[in-house]
Regions:
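P-loop NTP-binding core
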Residues: 1-199
Length: 199
């Protein structure tokens, strides 16, 4: 856990290999759940991930940071370390309300950055059979025409089956609808900012 090693940074020995060549994993620990209470007011805590990843850029082209949607130390770290943000928003009313708060937070954070953090909104678990999904997707397209990825990730039981089998979607079924959609999303993100970090 990079927070346990702070301020020393991120030793390479913390990285774990995966079944995919050139892809490594840096898992978190359960201590992150209590980080906010453990380190109140500690200086420099919001830059731990950014400083740690800076030591690894000679070995990696991209870093994907998966953080909870709550504004706290983890989210601040992810935003500080990133050059591009991906916001998954299910096509449900409550998820859209949460997106509004997230965008407002980003607007405030961008005022203190040298360069605004671009973001892409993605609609996962989209079910075209339901009116709720269809109407919510229309709302997202109307409200965020520039930020919304115009495609979507469909509901696909093969993704759930892959997780249960302990495999990536491409390993489990490279031709499933969900896998093809995620592949298209990756291509879209890389084309937008080929040298970026994506959070």
């Amino acid at each position: 856990d990079v927070y346990k090693r702070q301020p020393q940074g991120l030793p390479k020995q913390l990285l774990l290999p995966t079944s995919h060549e050139h892809i490594s994993l840096l898992p978190s620990s359960t201590a992150l759940a209590t980080l906010e209470r453990q380190s109140p007011g500690q200086s420099g805590l919001g830059l731990v991930i950014a400083k740690s990843l800076a030591q690894l850029w000679q070995d990696f082209d991209y870093a994907v940071i998966d953080s909870p949607p709550l504004l706290g130390v983890l989210m601040v770290n992810a935003l500080a370390a990133s050059q591009q943000l991906v916001i998954p928003v299910q096509t449900e009313f409550l998820a859209v309300k949460g997106l509004e708060r997230m965008v407002n937070t980003l607007t405030m954070i961008n005022r203190s950055r040298k360069q605004a953090l671009p973001y892409t909104i993605v609609s996962p678990l989209f079910d075209r059979r339901t009116q709720a999904s269809l109407s919510t997707l229309r709302l997202l397209k109307h409200t965020y025409p520039e930020q919304l990825w115009q495609a979507y990730i469909p509901v696909d039981t093969r993704l759930r089956d892959a997780s249960r089998a302990g495999l990536t979607p491409s390993q489990f079924d490279g031709n499933s609808r969900g896998t093809i959609a995620y592949r298209a999303l990756l291509k879209h993100l890389l084309a937008q900012q080929p040298a970026s970090q994506v959070a």
